Amino acid sequence: MDFKDYYKILDVEPAADDKAIKTAYRKLARKYHPDVSKEAGAEDKFKEASEAYEVLSSPEKRAEYDELRKYGRQGRPFQTPPGWQSRAGAGAGGFEETADFSEFFSSIFGGRPQQGGRTRNPGRKGQDVEMELAVFLEETLSGESKQVSFKVPQHSPNGQRMGDITKTLNVKIPAGVVDGERIRLKGQGAPGIGGGANGDLYLIIRLAPHPMFEVEGHDLVITVPLAPWEAALGTKVAVPTLTSRLNLTIRPDSQNGQRLRIKGNGLMNKSGERGDLYAQLKIVMPKQTDEAARALWQKLADSAAFDPRAQWKG
């Protein structure tokens, strides 16, 4: 096996302090992280930098490594001195799994299960990440793909927080999602520590407010403004839906607040069936009237035998 010069790998001097070592590792980890870098061999460089940091960030391991460093040079064959036994051990820095580390590391600090020996520690699962995702009502009908970007916490091999990276994914949103629903994307959270499994990403669906529709379960409600004479005489109105417009017949003598059901034009459920759209009528008075219009209103008032407050009279 070849000797590894951990100082050269991190590009620091042998006298570098802990801060310089940490800074150098963070720089390399961000550059070569498998979720970020598309460079050939990036994953191997990331593991190599992690191994170097595991040793140099631990005072015990670093002291033992410095003791052995005089016996080898980077890339040259190396063998531990006869009778060598690590006092620090593979897990002294808090790292729970060294199976991804090199034979060189294991020859110094141990950490690989011996033949027929104990079951290896599976390490720690990475941190789960949650984020809210705004979804438009129209997108819930067809299962749209959306690009999401989110922060993923990064940790050193010994579990120390090293900052965040930004990760971007194209995510297909299932049709029929509802507000508050949680969608799990397995393994898209923070990387595992010590060979542990990656955490998961949880998307919390938030239905974006719509300028025309209110949501009631899988049903939608739209307010349909009507002039007083339209409500009295009846009319046809082109009512918007999520996908088109439909002609709705308003019968004569319609009332303010009345709801008309338009079947199958609401939101989709998990079974692929759609709720209903309710058109709620709202009688709207003109903001201004001229003398001729007021004369017509007065004529109507004089001739109509209608008292809207009749129920108040005992």
Curated annotation (Swiss-Prot):
It is found in: Cytoplasm, Nucleoid. Its main location: cytoplasm. Disulfide bonds: none annotated. GO terms for cellular component: cytoplasm; nucleoid. The keyword Cytoplasm applies. Keywords: Chaperone, Cytoplasm, DNA-binding. Residues 73-92 are annotated as: Disordered. PROSITE patterns: DNAJ_2. GO terms for biological process: chaperone cofactor-dependent protein refolding; protein refolding. Residues 5-69 form the J domain. GO terms for molecular function: bent DNA binding; unfolded protein binding. The keyword DNA-binding applies. InterPro entries: DNA-bd_curved-DNA, DnaJ_C, DnaJ_domain, HSP40/DnaJ_pept-bd, J_dom_sf. It comes from the Bacteria. NCBIfam families: PRK10266.1 (NF007618). DNA-binding protein that preferentially recognizes a curved DNA sequence. It is probably a functional analog of DnaJ; displays overlapping activities with DnaJ, but functions under different conditions, probably acting as a molecular chaperone in an adaptive response to environmental stresses other than heat shock. Lacks autonomous chaperone activity; binds native substrates and targets them for recognition by DnaK. Its activity is inhibited by the binding of CbpM. This is Curved DNA-binding protein. It comes from Pseudomonas syringae pv. tomato (strain ATCC BAA-871 / DC3000). The lineage of its organism: Bacteria, Pseudomonadati, Pseudomonadota, Gammaproteobacteria, Pseudomonadales.
